[in-house]
């Protein structure tokens, strides 16, 4: 029996969304991708560099899919363009906050792929905040869009354990693959008409606000474990930062340092150089700093930093 494919619009921009689009195309689903919506080309590595397509646009062009670049999702013209396509379903993965005039155009609904186990970590930076908080489990959620951000009825969840040394970049890569599986499963349920949703429990809500210059600065007045979680939660971008000698100092990678000799931690943020390794103190112990970047310099490992720059034990980070 011939089944008319569902007309699908995919909306996404960064690397995180790429596996989902690829999975939709590769899966044996009764869907037709009638439009891919993404952000406009922009310089993405350095200021004043040549504009580059988004990762999603690059893949869409490779796959021969039509692409629409949108600057302002609230522009009435965008909503009209979506309506003209007569979508059955809209899939959103790491895109923008859509107005009802856009997501309401989908006959069977619009759903979002979110990189947390909702209602935990609602917001713009769920992966980062889960790691910063020391969570041992993360995952993805698909849910139907409604007016309040990240509050819609849940379609399905997929969970995964978090390794204690895993950073935000690594976890994002894993969750993008798990998320692609979730998107395909969700579409299959929608196509079959077998979706069963559940409301989010508001008593379990936690927030994952946007990362800023202010909330990515290292506060050394916390435990060594919390410092390590903060650093890996922001690696490799936007990166945890502090100051040293009045200059910005980024820390990309750290490790717990239980084997550091029983030296008094001193004031939180104290630097210790021992055995060719670089350490910094928290309130109850040490972390080892493994890779870093001084203001105006390229990223380097701690060994290179110690060989090339004057550094002494007892100096305070954050100064």
Curated annotation (Swiss-Prot):
The gene is fmt. This is Methionyl-tRNA formyltransferase. The keyword Transmembrane helix does not apply. Disulfide bonds: none annotated. (6S)-5,6,7,8-tetrahydrofolate binds at residues 116-119. HAMAP family: Formyl_trans. Its EC number is 2.1.2.9. GO terms for molecular function: methionyl-tRNA formyltransferase activity. It catalyses: L-methionyl-tRNA(fMet) + (6R)-10-formyltetrahydrofolate = N-formyl-L-methionyl-tRNA(fMet) + (6S)-5,6,7,8-tetrahydrofolate + H(+). Attaches a formyl group to the free amino group of methionyl-tRNA(fMet). The formyl group appears to play a dual role in the initiator identity of N-formylmethionyl-tRNA by promoting its recognition by IF2 and preventing the misappropriation of this tRNA by the elongation apparatus.
């Amino acid at each position: 029996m011939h089944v008319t494919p569902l007309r699908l619009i995919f909306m996404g921009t960064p690397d995180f969304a790429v596996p989902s689009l690829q999975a939709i195309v590769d899966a044996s689903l009764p869907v037709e991708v009638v439009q891919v919506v993404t952000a406009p080309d922009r310089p993405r590595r350095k200021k004043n560099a040549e504009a580059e397509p988004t990762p999603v646009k690059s893949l869409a062009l490779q796959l021969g899919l039509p692409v629409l670049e949108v600057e302002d999702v609230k522009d009435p013209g965008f909503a009209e363009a979506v309506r003209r396509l007569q979508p059955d379903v809209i899939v959103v993965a790491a895109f923008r906050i859509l107005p009802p005039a856009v997501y309401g155009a989908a006959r069977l609904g619009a759903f979002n792929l979110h990189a947390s186990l909702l209602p935990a970590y609602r917001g713009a930076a769920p992966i980062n905040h889960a790691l910063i908080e020391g969570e041992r489990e993360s995952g993805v959620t698909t849910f139907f869009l409604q007016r309040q951000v990240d509050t819609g009825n849940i379609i399905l969840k997929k969970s995964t354990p978090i390794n204690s040394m895993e950073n935000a970049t690594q976890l994002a890569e894993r969750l993008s693959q798990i998320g692609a599986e979730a998107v395909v499963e969700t579409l299959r349920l929608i196509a079959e008409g077998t979706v069963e949703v559940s409301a989010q429990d508001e008593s379990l809500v936690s927030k994952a606000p946007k990362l800023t210059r202010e909330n990515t600065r290292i506060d050394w007045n916390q435990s060594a474990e919390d410092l390590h979680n903060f650093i890996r939660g922001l690696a490799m971008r936007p990166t945890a930062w502090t100051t040293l000698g009045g200059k910005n100092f980024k820390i990309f990678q750290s490790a717990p340092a239980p084997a550091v000799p029983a030296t008094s931690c001193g004031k939180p943020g104290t630097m210790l150089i021992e055995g060719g390794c670089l350490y910094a103190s928290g309130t109850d112990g040490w972390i080892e700093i493994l890779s870093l970047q001084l203001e105006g310099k390229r990223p380097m490992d701690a060994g290179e930093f110690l060989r090339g720059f004057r550094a002494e034990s007892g100096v305070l980070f954050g100064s």
